[in-house]
Amino acid sequence: KRVKAWWSERGIEITGMQALLFGTSGLNVFGTADVQEAMLAHLEAVCRIGAGLGSVRIVFGSPKNRDRSGLTDHEAMEIAIPFFRRLGDIAAIHGTFICLEPNPPCYGANFMTTSAETAHVVQEVSHPAIRMQLDTGSLRINGENVSISLEMYADLIGHVHLSEPDLLPLGDGGIDHAKVRAALTQYLPGQLVTIEMVATKDEPHIVSIERALKVAVRHYRSNECEALA
C-alpha cells in the first residue's frame, strides 16, 4: 500500500507487472510436477503483490521459463493448457489476469513465438483470467500485420505493449506508430497501452525516456488511447 500510495501521490498509476520470474532459477512451464508447483507458488505471490499495487495486468513473457525443447506441438499443449488454467484460477482469486506474451525466437523463445500461436493457447486454455498480450515489437520482428492481428484477436487481448525490436526506445525501431494507433482505435478503443523498453547505453536514461514519452504522447495520448510509461 505504501508503494502504491507513493506513486499515486506523484500522479502515476501502477497498471501492470512483467519480468515475473526475474531472479528465479530452474522454473519452467514444461518442468516436472515439483517444478510446476514451485513456479505456480511464485506466480501466486506475484499476483498477490500485483493486486495490492492495483496492477491487475500480469504479463507472462519469460521465454526461458517456457522452454518446450524435446516436445512435439501436441505434447507441449497437453502440458501448457492445464498449467495455464491453474494459473488462471490463481490470478482470478486475486482479481488479476495473466497476459501471455508472444516472444519471437530471437528473444530466446520456442513456445508462443507469434500472435497466432499465443492466441491458440489462450483459446485452448479458455479461462477468463488468461488473456493475450499484444506486443508491437514482436509483431514487427515476426513480420505480422498489426491491423490483421487486432482484427483477429482483439477479443483475446488483455494488454498492449508499445515496444520496438530489441526493446529500443519507442520510435527508434522503425515501427509505424500512426498505423498502430489507427488499428488500436478501430479494434481496441479505450485500451490502455504501455511503453516497454530497456535502458540505453549511449545516452542518459532520462533523455531516452523523454524521447519515448514524446513518441507515445504524439501518437497515442487521446480520449481513445492513453500511453503510460
Regions found by a protein language model. Give the residues of each.
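Active-site acidic/histidine proton-transfer and metal-coordination neighborhood
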Residues: E9, G26-R131, I141, N223
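Short, well-structured secondary-structure segments
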Residues: E13-M17, I58-V59
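Aromatic-lined substrate-binding rim segments of carbohydrate-active enzymes
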Residues: K1-G11
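Conserved, mostly hydrophobic/aromatic
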Residues: W7, M17, G50, A80, ...
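Histidine-acidic metal/acid-base catalytic patches
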Residues: L40, G54-V56, S115-L134, S138-A229
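Short, flexible/disordered intra-domain loops and linkers
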Residues: K1, G108, E203-V207
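Short active-site-adjacent helix-start/loop capping segments
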Residues: T15, G23-N28, E203
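Active-site-proximal loop/turn and secondary-structure-junction residues that shape catalytic pockets
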Residues: L20-G23, K64-R66, P102-C106, T136-S138, ...
